[in-house]
């Protein structure tokens, strides 16, 4: 059960903090590592080696930097990968080169207990084919590809344009989005992990993109050796043609029970308590 696990967030900026907020809302123990902001941030931080030693799940949310005291290029090298706890889940949704992918192949073959979820890959758009079968969930750098995310970006440009033109921004971001889905939540107790997973998959089932990724990259490359070229490997094509998923906020939950489930708003769902 996720609530019994300790999750480490490497990189506590906007994305990492959002992940931490969701996990903490669900009651998960979260540890943070971010040497760049720790001196000016009131939250508690620990060293990376301490985080690796303590955490059952590690999620990476750092920019890629090649030089300096806190460079992140190959932050997870062979030594750090080998130091992961037994059964650790390692998630990378930031930049592929934060993990040495060649070392990752070597360590994963030696330690199948480590579980991998990769949205980003060293050498994109040409991921190492040997790595893909070793990964539990694989996607083509689409973690940020949500409809709400696109709408937020468009709305920010709209607001800036209206400011430059000296006009009132009288449109709302919700006008850019389809209407909310409504789901009646009738519970006598806090939804368990299985129920939350069902809700999440109702909005977006990650397994679909995982299946498409493997089929596109592995199956197509075996049939067509030219598929590895920069312009013809399917990776960029999958990103370009990705059907943008909705976020949790697209789901309006109507609570008809008597339990206190307002904490679900911290996961991003809409409508709780209304």
UniProtKB/Swiss-Prot annotation:
Any Pfam family matching the protein: DUF3410
Involved pathway(s): Cofactor biosynthesis; pyridoxine 5'-phosphate biosynthesis; pyridoxine 5'-phosphate from D-erythrose 4-phosphate: step 2/5
Keywords: Cytoplasm, NAD, Oxidoreductase, Pyridoxine biosynthesis
Chief localization: cytoplasm
Active-site residues, Swiss-Prot/TrEMBL: 95, 124, 141
Chain positions recorded as substrate binding sites: 145
GO BP terms, alphabetized: pyridoxine biosynthetic process
GO molecular function term, any single one: hydroxypyruvate reductase [NAD(P)H] activity
Subunit structure: Homodimer.
Entry protein name: Erythronate-4-phosphate dehydrogenase
Enzyme Commission number(s): 1.1.1.290
Enzymatic class: oxidoreductase
Subcellular location: Cytoplasm
Family according to the record: Belongs to the D-isomer specific 2-hydroxyacid dehydrogenase family. PdxB subfamily.
Sequence positions that bind NAD(+): 34, 119, 144
Organism phylogeny: Bacteria, Pseudomonadati, Pseudomonadota, Gammaproteobacteria, Alteromonadales
């Amino acid at each position: 059960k996720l609530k019994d696990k300790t999750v480490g967030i490497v990189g506590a900026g906007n994305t990492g903090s959002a992940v931490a907020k969701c996990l903490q809302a669900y009651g998960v123990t979260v540890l943070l590592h971010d040497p760049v902001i720790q001196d000016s941030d009131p939250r508690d931080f620990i060293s990376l080696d301490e985080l690796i030693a303590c955490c059952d799940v590690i999620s990476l949310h750092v920019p890629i930097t090649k030089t300096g005291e806190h460079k992140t290029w190959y932050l997870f090298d062979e030594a750090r990968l080998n130091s992961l706890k037994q059964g650790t889940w390692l998630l990378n949704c930031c930049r592929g080169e934060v993990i040495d992918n060649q070392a990752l192949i070597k360590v994963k073959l030696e330690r199948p207990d480590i579980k991998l979820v990769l949205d980003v890959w060293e050498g994109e758009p040409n991921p190492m084919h040997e790595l893909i079968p070793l990964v539990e969930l694989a996607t083509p750098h689409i973690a940020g590809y949500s409809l709400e995310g696109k709408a937020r970006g468009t709305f920010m440009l709209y607001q800036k344009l209206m400011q430059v033109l000296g006009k009132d921004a009288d449109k709302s971001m919700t006008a850019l989005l389809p209407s909310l889905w409504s789901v009646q939540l009738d519970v006598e107790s806090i939804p368990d992990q299985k129920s939350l997973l069902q809700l999440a998959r109702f909005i977006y089932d990650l397994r679909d993109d995982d299946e498409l990724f493997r089929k596109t990259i592995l199956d197509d490359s075996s049939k067509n050796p030219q598929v590895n070229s920069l312009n013809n490997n399917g990776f960029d094509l999958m990103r370009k043609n990705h059907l943008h998923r909705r976020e949790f906020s697209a789901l309006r939950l109507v609570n008809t029970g008597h339990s206190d489930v307002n904490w679900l708003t911290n996961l991003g769902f809409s409508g709780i308590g209304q």
